[in-house]
């Protein structure tokens, strides 16, 4: 029939039973259940090296996980399944790292996955207390905006998205982006059929490992109403060439659980991009608010530059970027007319980094009724004393906040 679904095979040792409430649904056998019929469930296909007795399930041909391949906290296969032989062993992951490390102006990263309906953030291997306070506050502020736009919760992987309570996940892309580049990276798990069906999911790992019959029935009925029943193939008898009588059927996983059904795809993409644009809009943005020359007489001019970061994020984007020395300070370069002389100040000046509006995110009292203001760390003023006349230019460069220019005229025209 052109589909790879599931096989259910009647077996007194089986772990599953047919639901009494809907014959399509398989439910787990209870510890004290002795009344069959019981079933085993397999992915549709043939058994490898079948000898008439053992029914060995073939290993997945897709054992490599690109999201366990990144250099941050990478671990070998015996410790982290899917990690591959060494970090960045695959051309795809190497290409991503080469792209990002060669572009110093990246201020944020979004990575799209399916499925689950949750927005994830670093770290995977550390609690929030290990993250610099400002970075954590920014992550929470951006995450809250994500919750508003996407309608899904934002969760720390370490605290809320672990497959095993005794293990952490290694070699993850968004961890690498944050720890190596100092950029705030999120992983969006797109689409949740459970949410569409009105099922409340609080534990995003446990729910998919083991959920109630009530929840499964609710999801099954949702696809009956909204997909015309096309998301599930009813079980039918089939003679398997190796083991004989089986039944074929089950969920069409690709466009029910794993991805949105086609008619829901556009809405899902629109939400995802809306948050991506909001995330991008939070980046730092340099602005020259004033650049002028004041004539002091005797061929002297006082040159003044007022510079500001009008973005939400600081020009360094994160504290970790500073700690790991992966971002250069903002640089101001003055361009003087021929024969002009600089008496006070430097032609090239490093001004450090400018805070963004996010500086308030770390304040203890951020409610406006109690807020008492902050220092003007979002702004810088530079002054020079110049002897000479003509056009004076200024260029302000930041790896992550852009480049801005202006000019003024010294002396009478």
Q: What are these language model-derived features?
A:
Residues 27, 37-38, 43-296, 302, ...:
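Metallocarboxypeptidase
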Residues 308-413:
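C-terminal beta-sandwich/jelly-roll accessory domains of carbohydrate-active enzymes
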Residues 21, 83, 163, 202-205, ...:
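General N-terminal targeting signals
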Residues 14, 124-126, 317, 322:
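Residues in and immediately flanking transmembrane alpha helices
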Residues 1-7, 12-18, 23-25, 52-54:
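Acidic, glycine-anchored loop motifs typical of Ca2+
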Residues 19, 129-131, 327:
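A generic membrane alpha-helix/interface feature
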Residues 6-11, 17, 29-44:
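Serine/threonine-rich low-complexity intrinsically disordered regions
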